[in-house]
């Protein structure tokens, strides 16, 4: 009896995380994994921050109408743990300029602008990184398109960005080799430690949290 086509598709179909990784990796060119990881992860952050901002922005517009003072108040975003993004730091702006020759500089300015408006991120984001590594603007634009298409695979109850971020971290750790993936702790070890210490109450202090994946 012939096998069902749906079964074969299930076995061969790649996850969206794997598809994104493969597509992004093809655009890497001569950039080494330790460098390229910042390119990919920063774009994922910008997309994530942009999605969260737009949802909060729409909520505020519905509540306050065209009152820009209230709609554009950083505090109105911070109270719900959303980063406030100036116009030139928003994902729509990045997408609109994705094919421009100075897109690297625009991304650097976006990251700097987000830090300036959100003190909790001070020193956490790459500074003038895209401009310094000399990545081809056409390849960077294509990578932005890939990251932009992530949104169509999201659902309201799914931590999609968390899964993609963790997937990329694990793959970069593998590419960098032994001793160079210190920032990433395998999920199996994270689960084991969490089950052992049962951190379900109070506060957790970790002065060497790295990417923060264990907290997530």
Regions picked out by a protein language model, each given a short descriptive name:
Residues 211-216:
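Conserved SAM-binding loop of SAM-dependent methyltransferases across substrates and taxa
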Residues 1-200:
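Non-catalytic, mostly N-terminal accessory regions of nucleic-acid modification and defense proteins
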Residues 201-208:
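Conserved class I S-adenosyl-L-methionine
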